[in-house]
């Protein structure tokens, strides 16, 4: 990245990280990683004709399935001081797009509402921002320090992307339920199935991402005909990643089919892996 800064200082650079959890894990990628990925995809989805961009990534990140480009584009939101923005509508947008309501905003993907103020930490932002409303008029947008809560600078506006790769809407929940039952049969005892059916987030639900959308994409669908530069060991890295995914899937599948002893010390519920 330092080399790119030297040779192309004027071109914006986007970091696109891989999930920081194992394939078929019981935990989700961290909020910071999910936020960074969605911020990058949102920027790329709306970047046509906006000038050159450089995306810095890894093979693990590039081949990871994502929501379709249409979903990413539809989740974008922007506003500027002087515009009419309903606080209720904005709050609903944040909740629907994976932001977590908190009393005080400290991490990416969080938001807080206090009267005519909305604090939020947009994906990809260096600092959280504070939206100051008078009624339904957005009066100002300010960046602030999460530790001190003090304003650091005034901003011309706000651009938001979804904070998570799984958006729980009526449509996506219904699609997940149908796909899960088709793949694994009736699963009323599955914690992921139960939580999603109730419209709740569940740790690790991103590992069933294809069930939430009619189609999925990868980073390459957002780049289009852009130039791609590969490190010389990319084939080896891709093969290693594919092997790791296959190994983790096989381990989960074997565990699912293995008989469970009544006296088994394994208390975790069965994990129903989606084939890669």
Q: Residues of each region from the PLM?
A:
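ASCE RecA-like P-loop NTPase motor cores
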Residues: 1-276
